[in-house]
């Protein structure tokens, strides 16, 4: 299995190691740089891994036998340490001076630090690598324990078994409705009524909103009796008696205003004297003319009249009907300039 080598021959120990590596190499051609033998043993199939493990065990036995052989043993031990350190990394190996020490402090963590309960030294497996499964399981257990201590937002779950039934809910609802109906029947026998002062306006405010829509020009001292809002039953009886007495006194005054027999007799004498001795007054002549004119207008035949804009469209707010009503109202002068009801003659 030895190949023809150009140059000085290697020592016996290195030659055997080289032959073992040649056996482990894949006979198929590879384009590009070849991976180290240890990486190939990790990425190959189970059969290759078994062969690699057997070859590594043989190399270990040979190295143990040649521990006392001088520089060869040191070189082999150094190569084995380099292979163990470089396992899991791609690319060129670091020089021996840059090798990470076993007792070196942990690398600084960038970002917020975990609570003290979450910090745990990572465990290593048989090959010297960190086992992420154990660390993740530890974190999951810690998170579960810490989650129980956190404040719970929202309704708390029931502490005991919940006994809910649709039938019982319907029965309770029917019972509440029955009680409501029975109580309503009892209350109907006693109707609730409001007092009169809550539903009726005071006498002074009966015509509220029907009066003039202007402000008062003068101060009104007679603001009205507002004691109706606070009257007791005794006050109402007292006021009712006062109103009856006031009505009686008012009726007595009306009786006094009635014309006496003397005034009536004198009025008849004056009217007979005026008819016989005096001529007809201007007021009487005016009334007679109005009556005759009204009779003529009534008997007059109505004819078709031409279109009048003011009358037909009622442009002017003061139309003919309002004009006639105003004239008719001004004719009744006797209501303003007539004699009084009592004491007609001195």
UniProtKB/Swiss-Prot annotation:
A motif (GPALPP motif 4) lies at residues 111-116. The modification Phosphoserine is found at residues 28, 104, 136, 141, 146. A motif (GPALPP motif 1) lies at residues 7-12. There is a cross-link at residues 277, 314 (Glycyl lysine isopeptide (Lys-Gly) (interchain with G-Cter in SUMO2)). InterPro entries: DUF3752, GPAM1-like. A motif (GPALPP motif 3) lies at residues 91-96. A motif (GPALPP motif 2) lies at residues 32-37. The keyword Ubl conjugation applies. Keywords: Acetylation, Isopeptide bond, Phosphoprotein, Ubl conjugation. Pfam families: DUF3752. Residues 123-132, 169-193, 233-267, 293-308 have a biased composition (Basic and acidic residues). Residues 1-283, 289-308 are annotated as: Disordered. Residues 60-69, 142-152 have a biased composition (Acidic residues). The modification N-acetylalanine is found at residue 2. Coiled coil: none annotated. Residues 106-115 have a biased composition (Pro residues). This is GPALPP motifs-containing protein 1.
């Amino acid at each position: 299995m030895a190949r023809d080598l150009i140059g000085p021959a290697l020592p016996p120990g290195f030659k055997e190691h080289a032959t073992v590596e040649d056996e482990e190499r894949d006979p198929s051609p590879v384009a590009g740089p070849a991976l180290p033998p240890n990486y190939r043993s990790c990425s190959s199939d189970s059969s290759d891994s078994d062969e690699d493990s057997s070859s590594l065990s043989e190399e270990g036995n040979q190295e143990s036998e040649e521990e006392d052989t001088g520089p060869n043993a040191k070189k082999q031990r150094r190569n084995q340490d380099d292979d163990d350190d470089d396992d899991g990394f791609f690319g060129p190996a670091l020089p021996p001076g840059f090798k990470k020490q076993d007792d070196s402090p942990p690398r600084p963590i960038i970002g917020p630090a975990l609570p003290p309960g979450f910090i745990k030294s990572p465990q290593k497996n048989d090959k010297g690598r960190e086992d992420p499964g154990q660390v993740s399981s530890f974190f999951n257990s810690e998170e579960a324990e810490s989650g129980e201590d956190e404040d719970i937002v929202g309704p708390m779950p029931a502490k005991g078994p919940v006994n809910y039934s649709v039938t019982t809910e319907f029965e309770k609802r029917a019972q509440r409705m029955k009680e409501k109906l029975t109580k309503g029947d009892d209350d109907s026998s006693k109707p609730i009524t409001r007092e009169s002062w809550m539903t009726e306006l005071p006498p002074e405010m009966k015509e509220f909103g029907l009066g003039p829509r202007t402000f008062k020009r003068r101060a009104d001292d007679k603001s009205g009796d507002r004691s109706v809002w606070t009257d007791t039953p005794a006050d109402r009886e007292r006021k009712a008696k006062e109103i009856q007495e006031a009505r009686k006194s008012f009726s007595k005054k009306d009786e006094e205003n009635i014309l006496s027999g003397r005034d009536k007799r004198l009025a008849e004498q004056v009217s007979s004297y005026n008819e016989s001795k005096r001529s007809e007054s201007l007021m009487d002549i005016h009334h007679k003319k109005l009556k005759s004119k009204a009779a003529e207008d009534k008997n007059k035949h109505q004819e078709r009249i031409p279109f009048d804009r003011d009358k037909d469209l009622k442009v002017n707010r003061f139309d003919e009907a309002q004009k006639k009503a105003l004239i008719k109202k001004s004719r009744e002068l006797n209501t303003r300039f007539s004699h009084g009801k009592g004491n007609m003659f001195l």
